[in-house]
Design a protein with these regions (language model features):
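C-terminal substrate-binding subdomain of Rossmann-fold SDR/epimerase-dehydratase oxidoreductases
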Residues: 2-129
Length: 129
């Protein structure tokens, strides 16, 4: 529904100047939550875990993949950095893998974006029905 996506900053100390983030598929995130709950019940021990794939992707790269998956260009606008935004946020997932023996099922950004777009389209169809 948005006319364009705002890229907040292109002057970060990253290869393309945009922020880098660790994106995760919602199904993998849900799987982690289930495994964490099972671990808590079994071991009676809570932990703090980083959820992600342990690799970062720039905002520009995400939009390039989204354009390819969507078969339609997403309009973008360059904006200023937001206060407090870090140049790079990538999860250290070693504890997650060690403690929960978790392995990602959807560790492909094209698939993550494709399923997100499909979900949004389904929501819009239901909204317009």
């Amino acid at each position: 529904k948005r006319e364009k996506v705002v890229i907040f900053g292109n002057d970060y100390p990253t290869p393309d100047g945009t922020a880098i983030r660790d994106y995760i598929h919602v199904s993998d995130l849900a799987d982690i939550h289930v495994k964490a709950a099972e671990h808590l019940v079994t071991n009676q021990q809570s932990n703090i875990l980083n959820c992600g794939y342990g690799r970062g992707v720039s905002v520009k790269d995400v939009l390039e993949i989204a354009n390819a998956v969507n078969n339609k260009p997403i309009q973008t606008e360059m904006g200023s950095r937001r206060a407090g935004d870090a140049a790079m946020l990538v999860s250290n997932v070693s504890k997650l893998h060690q403690l929960l023996d978790w392995k990602p099922k959807h560790n492909d950004l094209s698939f993550i974006i494709k399923t997100a777009i499909e979900w949004e389209r389904k929501l819009m169809e239901n909204e317009n029905a």
